[in-house]
Amino acid sequence: MIELNKIYNEDCLEGMKKIPDGSIDMILCDLPYGTTASKWDSIIDFEKLWEEYERIISDNGAIVLTASGSFTHKVISSNEKLFRYKWIWIKSRPGNFVNANNRPMTKYEEILV
């Protein structure tokens, strides 16, 4: 069991195991996209991720994930039955500085619900 109002620095798949079934009203997550060679940017196993998300989300809860580029398709394809719609977040400043030398910086990100 996790303690409320406390920050945990741990693997999300391990941390979610401590969360009671159906107890979360909203999951808002900016997953690693797997677009860089950085260790922190490894794509999380979608099958394991969805297993935990579906277990902890309440009946009327929302799962909201940010995505961009080809990662958007990967997220939607990983669980099409739960995908409802997509919003476009238009940013006031372009981002994606990590890849600025390889590609244009983007001014939007997709929000998948």
What are the residue ranges of the model-derived segments?
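Core catalytic lobe of class I
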Residues: I2-V113
